[in-house]
Amino acid sequence: MEAAERTISKILTEQIRYEIPPYQRPYSWEKGNVEQLLGDVWDAFEADDEEYFIGSLITIERQKDELYDVVDGQQRLTTLNLIFARLRDAVSEPAKSTLGKRVLPKNELTGEEETPRLTLRQKDQSFFRRHVLASEEITEAISREIESKQDAPKIRLSENLGVIDHFLAQRDEKSLKLFANYLLTKVYVVFVTTASWQSAYRLFNVLNARGMPLSNADLIKNMLFARLGGASAKSEELDEQWLQLEEAIGIERLDQFLAHHRSSVTAIKARKTLHEEYKPLIEASDTPFSFLDGITTSARNYLRIQQNGFEDVAARRSLRPL
């Protein structure tokens, strides 16, 4: 394991790409988190502080000096991408191209977009690339769609772009260019790299006590990936199955559903936290996939109960108070 202080300029460089692994939680920073980050860094910029630290970035090195999985710090890293994308849009050339290279570089010969510096979870990446990195407008129709689906990560991305736009609109272009330069050259993170998924997994659990606490669903999902053995060829398949569960139930209601599922399986009162109650259940299962299959079946029944979708009149009447 290695740790070093690095400027944002060395983090968001043309040679390095980052991916959010499937076992990570989705983007969840709220408007207040973004306002605080912007306000704190702007205050340091105005005070001409020599350096300003914004926390740690813990990664697994998949390709030396080129590709990293983000274990901790993805909320800040994603938000930095939002900020630089909007700073790019707010300034003129040549600063626009300079900042654009930090988030979505282009081939200078063909003008085609290349691989983004950051890739989010599969479910969120298309929205992130189109509406954050490529600055495609988030129309009212798109906003209504993500609201109706209660798609929390996309709602957070959309809302936080609005926070950043409001913040930048109050400053002139010269100030924004100087602020962007300060962000790149005077703002630091502690950059930690490990080559081992097992080491990263231990760090992931230890770091749950810091920052935004992980939900029980996040921790249960993490245990499933641990049972799988980390970044195997099966991880994408497991991630897709979990995403289908999230979409069916809704991220905001997932903890509640998992509590009901545990009660229906064990038929005993919980004595520990929800994710601790799930640990022996996951360990006793044949595979993570068979365990998730059982949860998926339970989810379908749960949704029928929630929707009171039974033909039997007596059943509908008994479920109505729930």
Predicted segments with their positions:
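Extended charged low-complexity segments that act as oligomerization/scaffolding linkers
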Residues: 98-137
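A short beta-strand motif that forms part of the nucleic acid-binding face
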Residues: 72, 83-84, 205-207
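Hydrophobic, Leu/Ile/Phe/Ala-enriched alpha-helical segments that form helix-helix packing faces
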Residues: 41-45, 91, 168
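Polyanionic (Asp/Glu-rich) segments that form extended negatively charged tracts
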Residues: 123-322
